[in-house]
Amino acid sequence: MHDVYVTGVGAITCLGADMRSTWSAIERGRSGIHSVEGIDVRGCRIDFAGQVRGFLPPAGLEDADRGVQFAAAAVEEAMRTARLGPDDLRRLGTGAAVVVGSSKGGVLRFAALHKHWLHAGTGVTETSPLHEFWSSVPPSTAADTIAGRLRIRGARFCPVAACATGTVSVIRAAQLINDGCAELVLCGAADASIHPLWLGAFDRMGVLARPHPNDGPVGACRPFDAERTGFAIGEGAGMLILESARSVRKRDGLPLARIRSWALGADPSGLTGLDATAEPVLCVIRTSLDRAGLRSADIDVITAHATATRSNDAAEALAYRRFVATGSRPPAVTALKGAIGHMLGAAGSAELALSVEMLRRQQILPTANHARADNDTTGIHIIRHAQGSQLRHILKLSLGFGGHIAAIILSRP
C-alpha cells in the first residue's frame, strides 16, 4: 500500500482555458453558459451550452479532435503546476503512466468524417480523410496522444464510465500507485460534445435545462434549486498529476492534496434515474469514509455531482442528509455545474481538480444559480457565496448514466 498525492492540476472550462481563470470566474459567481457560437444548431430546441471560447490548441494538434486538444492542454498546465518536464517522465521509464478517459471518444471528428463521406461522393480514395478515423475517433485517442507526445512507456488506460469517467480515471490512476505499479500518473478526462446530435439526444431524454425566465441561459442550470429543470452541456478537460510519496520526496515535489480513499459502486435502477432511497449512493459514500478511517463529521465539503435534474438532485440530497450522523454538523455542499455546465465525461476530473484547489486555497467555491431549496433538496448546507474555511477533507461524488457511482476523499497533505 502506497500513499497517493496530487502534485499538479489543470483545467479547461467554459469559464477559462486554465485553472486560474476558471477559479476566478466561479469564485465571483459567474456562469459560462451562453448561446452556442460557430456550430449550426438550427432545429435544436436547446441552443446554449458551456462552450470554451478563444481556445488555442497545443502546437502540433491543430487538426486533432477538440477533446484531444483539451486533454493535451490541461496536461501541460498540470505538469507546469507540478514543476515537471518531459525528461522527468522519461527518467521514470515504465514507472510513469497515463489514465485519461473519455465518455464517448472523438465525436466531433467522427461527425466531420461522416459528413465528408456523405457529401464528397468519392468513397474511399487515397485523398479522402478517412485514414484519420483511427487516430482521432476512438475513446483512447487522448490517452494515446498524451503518452506519445511525452514518450511515456508505462501503463496506459482509457476508462469509460459515462459522466463518472473523470473520477473513475483518477481512481484507476490512484490504484496503480497504491498497488506499486506506477510512481507517477497523468490522469483525468476530456470531453467535447457540443453538437446538434448530443443537444438533441439529451433534450429527448428530458435532462437539459430550459432558459431561466429571468436570467436566460446563464441561469438555466440550477443545482439543488427549487426551479431546477436540468443541466447545460459543457466541454473541456480536468487533469491531475498523481505521485507516490517516494516520487514526491525524490524530486522535492510539493503535494497539493492527498487522495485519502476512494470507492466505486453502481445503481441498477435504470439508465438515468437513481434509487429514490439513495441507498446505492449512500453505500459508496460510506465505503469511502470507512476506507479513509474518517467519520461523517470529518468531511468539511462535499463537491456534489448535482446535474440539476429534478429526481436525481433529490436523491443525491437525500444521500447527503442520511450520510450525516445524528447530531453532527452537516458538511458544506458545493455544486459547480451551474457555473461550468455538465462536462459529461470530464465533469468528475474537472470538479476534482477544482476541489484540490479548494483545499490548497482553503476556500469553498459557490454553487452558481442556487437561490432556494425545495422540499426534496432542503436540509443540506449549500454554499451560495465563496467563503474561506479551514478545510481538511473534501468528498467528491460522481454519478453516470447507467448507474455508475464513484467517490474520492481528498485530504490536506
Q: Where are the language model's segments positioned?
A:
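Acyl-CoA/ACP chain-elongation machinery
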Residues: 181-229, 262-276, 306-313, 330-380
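Conserved small-residue
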Residues: 8, 26, 75, 98, ...
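Active-site-proximal alpha-helical scaffold in enzymes
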Residues: 71-83, 139-142, 150, 156-190, ...
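Phosphate/pyrophosphate-binding loops at sites that engage ATP/ADP/AMP, CoA/4′-phosphopantetheine
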Residues: 77-96, 149, 248-254, 284-301, ...
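Flexible, low-complexity linker/loop segments at domain and module junctions
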Residues: 1-6, 86-93, 292, 296-298, ...
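Condensing-enzyme catalytic core mediating Claisen C-C bond formation in acyl metabolism
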Residues: 3-7, 30-35, 213-292, 300-301, ...
